[in-house]
């Protein structure tokens, strides 16, 4: 006898489309990406939409929201992860990802889900404050949907099959995912990329009645672009080969006709 269809909540963590960082908006390519993303997400019955207050995320979300005829709730903490560290040599502010591997890999404390913010590499800035804000923000949001965090799991009286969609940025997205699956965000920040407009899917597992765990079933899925033979943007990725420009913004790289072929 065929079993009943599984019931699980889905959280779709969506990165904004290709950004124009100078104007906090989307590039022409980004608008095309957002339109294809909108077609994809409009086929999903979502119960709620949440969006970062930043322009590039709002513009990305607008393509989906117009198609479904709904509004999104703006959450200030969904803005790109605002935590920063202080460079031990220059004293200048740094974002807590995009470190060179040899700068962080020997810091084993950075892999500790509870104490990574106390590692010397993370001290001097406000990383712990923003990490706490991120965790609290996500837990408050989930509590509104019936899930209360306790000791790394979420308690719920009635697990549902609703879907919620978050339009956000790479750094904050990986921080959210890390919190949900109980790991430090450092290996996610340093070792993974979600290309612009990519969708990360997290679902619930209720292995004990009333106790829910989250599991990531898809990270950085850009199938809506590939199906339309659109190459994903490389924004967020450093150059494959050294070119003298240490930037994740492809618009700053020297022209290279092979660059966009990396993710075909």
PLM regions with names:
Residues 2-7, 81-95, 99, 153-163, ...:
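Acidic, low-complexity terminal tails and accessory targeting/binding regions
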Residues 5, 39-118:
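Phosphate-coordination/substrate-recognition cap region in phosphate-metabolizing enzymes
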Residues 6-27:
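Mobile, glycine- and charge-enriched loop segments
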Residues 10-14, 50, 161-168:
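Beta-strand elements within well-structured catalytic alpha/beta cores of enzymes
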Residues 14, 75-77, 217-219:
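Conserved beta-strand termini and adjacent loop/short-helix elements that scaffold enzyme active sites
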Residues 17, 170, 220-222:
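Active-site metal-binding loops of divalent metal-dependent hydrolases
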Residues 26-41:
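Short catalytic helix/loop segments, enriched in acidic residues and glycine
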Residues 120-153:
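Internal catalytic-core helix/loop-beta-alpha segment
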């Amino acid at each position: 006898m065929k079993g009943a269809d599984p019931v699980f909540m889905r959280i779709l963590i969506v990165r904004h489309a290709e950004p124009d960082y100078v104007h906090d908006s989307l590039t022409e390519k980004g608008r095309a990406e957002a339109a294809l993303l909108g077609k994809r997400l409009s086929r999903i019955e979502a119960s709620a939409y949440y969006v970062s207050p930043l322009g590039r995320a709002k513009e990305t979300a607008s393509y989906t929201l117009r198609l479904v005829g709904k509004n999104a709730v703006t959450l200030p903490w969904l803005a790109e992860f605002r935590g920063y560290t202080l460079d031990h040599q220059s004293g200048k502010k740094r974002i807590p990802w995009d470190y060179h591997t040899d700068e962080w890999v020997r810091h084993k404390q950075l892999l500790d889900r509870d104490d990574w913010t106390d590692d010397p590499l993370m001290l001097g800035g406000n990383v712990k404050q923003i990490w706490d804000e991120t965790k609290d923000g996500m837990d408050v949001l989930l509590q509104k949907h019936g899930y209360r965090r306790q000791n790394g799991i979420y308690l719920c009286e009635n697990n549902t099959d609703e879907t919620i969609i978050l339009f956000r940025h790479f750094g904050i997205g990986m921080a959210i995912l890390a919190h949900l699956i109980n790991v430090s965000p450092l290996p996610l920040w340093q070792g993974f990329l979600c290309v612009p407009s990519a969708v990360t899917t997290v679902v619930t597992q209720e292995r004990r009645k009333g106790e829910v765990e989250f599991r990531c079933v898809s990270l950085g899925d850009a199938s809506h672009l590939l199906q339309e033979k659109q190459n994903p943007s490389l924004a967020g990725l450093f150059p494959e080969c050294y070119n003298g420009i240490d930037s994740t913004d492809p618009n700053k790289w020297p022209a290279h006709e092979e660059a966009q072929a990396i993710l075909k």
